[in-house]
Amino acid sequence: MRRILNVLSSRAQRRLERIRTAPIRIHHKFRPSTQVSNGEFTWKYSTPTRETWVRAKTMFTKEPKTIDWLNTLPSKGTLWDIGASVGCFSLYAAKSRNAEVVSFEPMASTYSVLEENIHLNNLGSYIFP
Protein backbone atom coordinates (compact mmCIF):
# COMPACT_ATOMS: atom_id res chain seq x y z
CA MET A 1 0.00 0.00 0.00
CA ARG A 2 2.80 2.39 0.91
CA ARG A 3 4.44 1.73 -2.48
CA ILE A 4 1.19 2.59 -4.29
CA LEU A 5 0.94 5.82 -2.31
CA ASN A 6 4.54 6.67 -3.19
CA VAL A 7 3.86 6.07 -6.90
CA LEU A 8 0.70 8.14 -6.75
CA SER A 9 2.51 10.80 -4.81
CA SER A 10 5.31 10.81 -7.36
CA ARG A 11 2.83 10.96 -10.24
CA ALA A 12 0.92 13.77 -8.53
CA GLN A 13 4.15 15.66 -7.96
CA ARG A 14 5.08 15.41 -11.65
CA ARG A 15 1.61 16.58 -12.65
CA LEU A 16 1.78 19.53 -10.25
CA GLU A 17 5.23 20.43 -11.58
CA ARG A 18 3.90 20.42 -15.16
CA ILE A 19 1.01 22.67 -14.10
CA ARG A 20 3.38 24.97 -12.22
CA THR A 21 5.76 25.31 -15.17
CA ALA A 22 3.09 25.55 -17.90
CA PRO A 23 3.34 29.35 -18.23
CA ILE A 24 7.11 29.10 -18.69
CA ARG A 25 6.79 26.34 -21.29
CA ILE A 26 4.12 28.30 -23.18
CA HIS A 27 6.27 31.43 -23.02
CA HIS A 28 9.28 29.58 -24.49
CA LYS A 29 7.15 27.97 -27.18
CA PHE A 30 5.94 31.29 -28.58
CA ARG A 31 8.90 33.56 -27.85
CA PRO A 32 11.08 33.98 -30.92
CA SER A 33 14.43 32.26 -30.83
CA THR A 34 17.25 31.32 -33.17
CA GLN A 35 20.05 28.80 -33.25
CA VAL A 36 23.69 29.51 -34.00
CA SER A 37 26.32 26.88 -34.74
CA ASN A 38 30.06 26.88 -35.30
CA GLY A 39 30.00 23.36 -36.75
CA GLU A 40 31.00 21.76 -33.47
CA PHE A 41 28.51 23.26 -31.03
CA THR A 42 25.04 24.78 -31.31
CA TRP A 43 23.59 27.52 -29.12
CA LYS A 44 19.97 28.59 -28.84
CA TYR A 45 19.20 32.28 -28.26
CA SER A 46 16.06 34.07 -27.22
CA THR A 47 15.49 36.84 -29.74
CA PRO A 48 12.70 39.11 -28.49
CA THR A 49 14.05 42.03 -30.55
CA ARG A 50 15.77 42.45 -33.90
CA GLU A 51 18.91 43.59 -32.07
CA THR A 52 19.13 40.36 -30.07
CA TRP A 53 18.65 38.34 -33.26
CA VAL A 54 21.43 40.26 -35.02
CA ARG A 55 23.70 39.90 -31.98
CA ALA A 56 23.26 36.13 -31.95
CA LYS A 57 23.63 35.69 -35.72
CA THR A 58 26.80 37.82 -35.92
CA MET A 59 28.58 36.52 -32.82
CA PHE A 60 31.32 34.85 -34.89
CA THR A 61 31.75 37.62 -37.48
CA LYS A 62 31.29 40.82 -35.46
CA GLU A 63 34.06 40.13 -32.94
CA PRO A 64 36.23 37.31 -34.31
CA LYS A 65 39.20 38.36 -32.16
CA THR A 66 37.07 37.88 -29.04
CA ILE A 67 36.21 34.35 -30.18
CA ASP A 68 39.92 33.71 -30.88
CA TRP A 69 40.78 34.99 -27.40
CA LEU A 70 38.09 32.82 -25.78
CA ASN A 71 39.57 29.82 -27.57
CA THR A 72 42.79 30.40 -25.60
CA LEU A 73 40.89 30.05 -22.33
CA PRO A 74 42.01 26.85 -20.59
CA SER A 75 39.45 24.08 -20.53
CA LYS A 76 37.45 24.37 -17.30
CA GLY A 77 38.89 27.85 -16.77
CA THR A 78 37.00 30.83 -15.37
CA LEU A 79 35.72 33.82 -17.35
CA TRP A 80 34.36 37.07 -15.93
CA ASP A 81 32.09 38.56 -18.61
CA ILE A 82 31.59 42.21 -17.69
CA GLY A 83 28.76 43.75 -19.73
CA ALA A 84 27.58 40.31 -20.81
CA SER A 85 24.62 41.63 -22.80
CA VAL A 86 22.49 38.62 -23.85
CA GLY A 87 25.36 36.23 -23.11
CA CYS A 88 26.81 35.32 -26.51
CA PHE A 89 30.38 35.10 -25.22
CA SER A 90 29.36 33.68 -21.84
CA LEU A 91 27.49 30.87 -23.57
CA TYR A 92 30.34 30.31 -26.01
CA ALA A 93 32.93 29.98 -23.21
CA ALA A 94 30.72 27.75 -21.08
CA LYS A 95 29.88 25.34 -23.88
CA SER A 96 33.02 25.27 -26.03
CA ARG A 97 35.64 25.66 -23.27
CA ASN A 98 33.68 23.98 -20.46
CA ALA A 99 34.40 27.17 -18.51
CA GLU A 100 32.80 28.53 -15.37
CA VAL A 101 31.49 31.98 -16.25
CA VAL A 102 30.50 34.87 -14.01
CA SER A 103 28.36 37.22 -16.12
CA PHE A 104 27.52 40.82 -15.23
CA GLU A 105 24.76 42.68 -17.06
CA PRO A 106 23.36 45.84 -15.44
CA MET A 107 20.34 46.43 -17.71
CA ALA A 108 17.31 44.56 -16.35
CA SER A 109 15.69 43.84 -19.73
CA THR A 110 18.94 42.54 -21.20
CA TYR A 111 19.68 40.59 -18.02
CA SER A 112 16.35 38.76 -18.36
CA VAL A 113 17.30 37.67 -21.91
CA LEU A 114 20.72 36.57 -20.60
CA GLU A 115 19.02 34.40 -17.97
CA GLU A 116 16.67 32.95 -20.58
CA ASN A 117 19.61 32.11 -22.86
CA ILE A 118 21.37 30.34 -20.00
CA HIS A 119 18.19 28.32 -19.42
CA LEU A 120 17.66 27.53 -23.12
CA ASN A 121 21.17 26.07 -23.31
CA ASN A 122 21.04 24.20 -19.99
CA LEU A 123 24.15 26.04 -18.78
CA GLY A 124 22.90 27.07 -15.34
CA SER A 125 25.61 25.05 -13.63
CA TYR A 126 28.33 26.84 -15.64
CA ILE A 127 27.15 30.45 -15.89
CA PHE A 128 26.40 32.57 -12.85
CA PRO A 129 24.74 35.90 -13.69
Kindly label every feature range from the protein language model:
Residues 1-122, 126:
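S-adenosyl-L-methionine
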Residues 129:
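Donor nucleotide-sugar binding/catalytic pocket of nucleotide-sugar-dependent glycosyltransferases
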